[in-house]
Swiss-Prot record:
Function: Involved in the anaerobic metabolism of phenylalanine and phenylacetate. Catalyzes the oxidative decarboxylation of phenylglyoxylate to benzoyl-CoA and CO(2). It can also react slowly with 2-oxo-3-methylbutanoate and use different electron acceptors such as benzyl viologen, methyl viologen, FAD or FMN, but NAD seems to be the physiological electron acceptor. Also catalyzes an isotope exchange between CO(2) and the carboxyl group which proves partial or complete reversibility of the oxidative decarboxylation reaction.
Identification of the protein by name: NADH-dependent phenylglyoxylate dehydrogenase subunit beta
Any Pfam family the entry gives: TPP_enzyme_C
Organism name: Aromatoleum evansii (Azoarcus evansii)
GO molecular function terms listed in the Swiss-Prot or TrEMBL record: 4 iron, 4 sulfur cluster binding; metal ion binding; NAD binding; phenylglyoxylate dehydrogenase (acylating) activity; thiamine pyrophosphate binding
pH effects: Optimum pH is 8 when measured with benzyl viologen. Half-maximal activities are obtained at pH 9 and pH 6.8.
Length: 446
């Protein structure tokens, strides 16, 4: 399998042209405050109605044209880091590389008489933390791909999920990480609906899998785990259930096994409704959302109740580990998977993953990650973790959240909202944030 590389991402919507990134780069690379010598440059966009900015920075291209046009072989792409390096001993200062780069990422440093370009500061770019607005991010998710990309995909190819299904992405990543020595429970919902328990007489997974009722997933898995222990088999007990099968009809089973501290990892794929059976509302469906059972018309404007906060309910069970996660933040998700797996060896671990549904939420499948990311950036979804020993703390705190409308407008299920409904949702987001923040102030919730 090929190799992926870390990169520096730029969000022009957050850039105000302050130049702090250029100053930081100049200081790190030249020991001066001369931004003309910075290897990152921010330029105002000419003729724009609003003041917007563009980035001139080496993109460390997969097929770098600067390397191709260099007649002296002074530029080469490092196969480990992905960074295009410059060898001063070979450079003839012809500047052809500056012409070959489409991103203005390599330029002449007049003070030295040689070209200069970004080398990502050996993996710790000085420009990123210097940006006060978060317009620059060092994306290191490639590390996950490089680590697990060659691990076996334990779900069969060609599952019957909707185009761009976030749940399928989550299923494949989870099983890769948990590994083959696993017994899997998937109650009725999108996960078995797309093939985890089989289709045409063939199972969709490469691990033992069973299909419990909506009402008894955790109880049945606990019994199976205990039987494996009786015969001396240390297997990973894993449930992947939807929010309906966990927060509604399956809650008594979930709550009972959590209270007993059964040794399992229970993962909830929260797409905020019963999506497999026709997009009906669940108790995790947010206020105002359209579903087939909370329609929009003359007398109805979507769901009239706020969503149940199931993760916080599980915190009050004093589980060995509780966390929220999102596929938009894969490093955070993998870190929590590791902790949940470890905690499940001695107790009950609960992982609640927010999973946008392209079909029911009514947005294009190519915007899946953007919708998931906006949920976190607006604090509509908060990412945190809890253990009885360390209490609750944020793993991706958002101190300056975007307005909730930035999230709501991305989906058709909220397009009918009145200003009063939007105000209610924004107020609830702020209330939820303050509530969780109060919980983080106490070292031990239990």
């Amino acid at each position: 399998m090929g190799r992926a590389y870390s990169t520096i991402a730029f969000d022009p919507a957050k850039c105000d042209g302050c130049g702090d990134c250029m100053t930081a780069c100049a200081q790190a690379k030249t020991g001066t405050d001369d931004i003309a010598r910075s290897r990152i440059q921010i330029y105002g966009r000419e003729g724009a109605a609003d003041k917007t900015f563009e980035l001139a920075l080496c993109r460390q291209c997969a097929d770098p044209k600067c390397v191709t046009v260099c007649p002296a072989g002074a530029l080469n792409k490092d196969g480990t880091s992905g960074v295009i390096g410059w060898d001063a001993t070979k450079c003839v200062d012809c500047l052809l590389c500056t012409v070959g780069c489409a991103y203005a990422g390599i330029a002449l440093d007049e003070a030295t008489g040689h070209v200069a370009k970004c080398d990502t500061c050996d993996g710790n770019p000085a420009c990123v933390p210097a940006c006060p607005h978060g317009a620059l991010k060092h994306i290191t998710t490639a590390n996950i791909y490089n680590e697990v990309g060659d691990w076996e995909d334990l779900f069969a190819p060609g599952l019957a999920g909707c185009q761009g299904c976030n749940t399928e992405l989550l299923m494949r990543h989870t099983l890769r990480r948990v590994g083959p020595d696993t017994v899997l429970a998937t109650p009725p919902g999108c996960v078995p609906g797309m093939g985890s328990v089989g289709f045409n007489g063939t199972t969709g997974t490469k691990v033992p899998v069973f299909h419990p009722l909506l009402t008894n997933t955790a109880a049945m898995l606990a019994g199976i785990k205990r039987q494996y222990k009786r015969v001396g088999r240390d297997v990973q007990a894993l449930a992947i259930a939807g929010d309906g099968g966990a927060s509604d009809v399956g809650f008594q089973s979930l709550s009972g096994r959590a209270e007993r501290g059964e040794q399992m990892l229970f993962m909830v794929v929260d797409n905020e409704g019963y999506m497999n059976t026709g997009m009906q509302r669940s108790s995790c469906t947010p206020y105002g959302a359209w579903t087939s059972t909370t329609p929009v018309g003359e007398t109805s404007r979507g769901k009239t109740q706020d969503a149940k906060n199931l993760p916080l309910i599980m915190v009050n069970h004093r589980c060995a580990y509780v966390a929220t996660a999102s596929t938009a933040y894969m490093e955070d998700l993998y870190d929590k998977l590791d902790k949940a797996i470890a905690a499940s060896k001695n107790g009950f671990a609960y992982l609640h993953v927010y999973s946008p549904c392209t079909t029911a939420w009514r947005f294009p499948s190519n915007l899946n990650m953007e919708v998931a990311r906006k949920a976190v950036e607006t604090n509509f979804v908060m990412l945190w973790e809890y253990t009885p020993q360390d209490g609750l703390h944020f793993t991706k705190p958002v101190d300056d959240p975007l307005p909730v409308t930035d999230y709501l407008k991305a989906m058709g299920r909220f397009r009918h909202l009145t200003p009063e409904q939007v105000e209610h949702i924004q107020k609830k987001v702020v209330e939820n944030q303050k509530f969780v923040e109060r919980m983080t102030e106490h070292a031990h919730v239990g």
